[in-house]
């Protein structure tokens, strides 16, 4: 889930964007995992969902390997709306990689955040 104040924006090319609604310092946690809000799904659970729900969950989750197999995290709030950037201002650990000004779009690198993404491919644009 997002750990900073944000608002949604709109870009003609990207569509929905997540905009910082406060100044964020380099190294601050922009996103965090909170088990009270964020949901974790087992792959077998998702595989048995009806097609419409499975499609939604697969498109809105991040896949992580937890050492005992893959788990899918569905973050609470606007985090799934963050757009990809090969030079993101939020790193794969959820920290600001540089100072971010209020009004600036928050971006992440899908390849580093989701094990389903591979360098040179764009599976998130399905």
Placement of each model-derived feature along the sequence:
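Conserved catalytic SET/PR domain of SAM-dependent protein methyltransferases, capturing the structural core
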Residues: 1-126
């Amino acid at each position: 889930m997002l750990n900073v104040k944000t608002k949604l924006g709109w870009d003609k090319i990207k569509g929905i964007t997540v905009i910082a609604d406060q100044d964020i310092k380099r190294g601050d946690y922009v996103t965090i995992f909170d088990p009270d809000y964020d949901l974790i799904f087992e792959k077998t659970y998702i595989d048995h969902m009806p097609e419409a729900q499975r499609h939604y969950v697969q498109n809105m989750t991040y896949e992580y390997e937890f050492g005992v197999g893959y788990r899918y995290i569905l973050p609470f709030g606007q985090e799934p709306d963050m757009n990809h950037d090969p030079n993101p201002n939020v790193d794969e650990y959820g920290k600001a990689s540089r100072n971010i000004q209020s009004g600036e779009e928050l971006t992440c690198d899908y390849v580093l955040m989701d094990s389903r993404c591979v360098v040179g491919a764009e599976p998130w644009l399905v």
